[in-house]
Amino acid sequence: MNKLEPKEHFHGSDLEKIEEIYGIPKENIISFSANVNPLGISYDLRKELPKHLDAITRYPDREYTSLRKCIGEYVHTDYENILVGNGSTELISLVAQIMQPKNALIVGPTYSEYEHEISLVGGRSHYFRLQESDRFLLDIKALSKALTKDVDLLVLCNPNNPTSSQIDRQTMRIILDNCKEHGIFVMVDETYVEFAPHPEEITSIPLAEYYNNLIILRGISKFFAAPGLRLGYAVCGNRKLLHEIDSKKNPWTINSLAAIAGDRKS
């Protein structure tokens, strides 16, 4: 039997790379890797965005104030608690650069980019593994035991990719209290929250004002079916930390059309 040769690491939605490596025509691939809403972009966006093509002849507002205010209205928080980025991936990277975690605990199986970005700043990632026998539901008592003082960052995807398991807000409070006691920062990725039957019951955004060890990430790639626009945002009540992250960020990482797409008033 021939030994299987390992393939290079690449994102599962990179159909051109799959075609190149495996020889499968990209037209014959049905991709389940990116979890983008199959209904596609909204009718309003399809109709309105072409009207704003001239916007690419101008630099966008460096502070993205109108966009942040619109997002703030959408998620019911002060726009000063919001930082926008070039997709949630840029924000994951920025959080890692600022926090410089040495020992991160990631609830998995989950998105591989968390571990990748943590490794780039010299940190190590350990996994708290959800069990298929428990339908991938979080065992809060077991997680609490794993949150020891040598852990400095906890990463949660809620709802989780790929298991779809959810953590309700009351459970999240228990986790955050435990982490605060041990000096652990918590990054919650809510990229898939709009797919949940009741997003308002699981989002951690209402907790941002009460926990300075919490940051929540979201974006428009999945539910709003616009990964090519690259628009993500972070919500954090710790404004000192948010300003630190912003200071590390390059200017104008959100292009003009993405900013318009995210701003319902445009």
Predicted regions mapped to residue ranges:
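N-terminal "arm"/small-domain region of PLP-dependent enzymes with the aminotransferase-like
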Residues: 1-58
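PLP-dependent aminotransferase-like
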Residues: 97-156
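PLP-dependent aminotransferase class I/II
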Residues: 41-42, 63, 213-265
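Active-site pre-lysine segment of PLP-dependent enzymes
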Residues: 137-150, 162-186, 190-223
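Short acidic capping loops at alpha-helix termini that bridge into adjacent secondary structure
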Residues: 27-28, 78-82, 103, 190, ...
